[in-house]
Amino acid sequence: MGYMEEAIAFETRMGDGSSADQNLLGKLFSAGTRLITGESLFLTHFTNRGSSGKSRVAFSAPYPGTIIPVDLGTMPQGLIVQKDGFLAAARGTQISLHFNQKFGAGLFGGEGFILQKLTGDGKVFVHAGGTIIEKQLRNEMLRVDTGCVVAFEPGIDFSVARAGGLKSMIFGGEGLLLATLRGTGRVWIQSMPVKKLIQALAPWGGNARKESGTALGGIFGSLLDE
């Protein structure tokens, strides 16, 4: 959460809050699906308690990137999102697991095995690293780095396959696997998955520690000389 206005109240609850009269078993099941994806069992619910109209609450991204709104009211079958892509949603949105039926996608795809399915009639907000690209497939096929897939419509068939021959896999520098998206529907792709961001920053982190140590060593050396 970035900020919220005075009339906004918040409460942490178990489950996704998709049903106002959801019983304990339903809440446990909903929370369990989030646990499998590595997310928290609880979600924070924000409510406008004011009587003078609309109030605002703003959400910040977990790392540099782009936040996109998607209207589930125009998507009767819902939206499939990678497990780290969901950021926030209107009350009434159901968050469930979407297992890929193809064994290869689950065994080798990493991001491809456990996906989240969002259904409802309100807006959801999806986060992507770097720049986001929306592609409209019309009975077409698209190959993408597995980590770059953010979301896609259920009409899209998702699978994971080896990226070319052995030489390409070892020396290509583009990863061992590619995701194949085939069918008709929209696909959202991110330019900078968080894993790539971490890999890009890792060398600088080491240099920063080394330079910091050198600077501290110089300071202590000067103090001792005195």
Task: Walk through the language-model features, giving the residues of each.
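Composition-driven recognition of glycine/serine/threonine/acidic- and proline-rich low-complexity segments
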Residues: 1-226
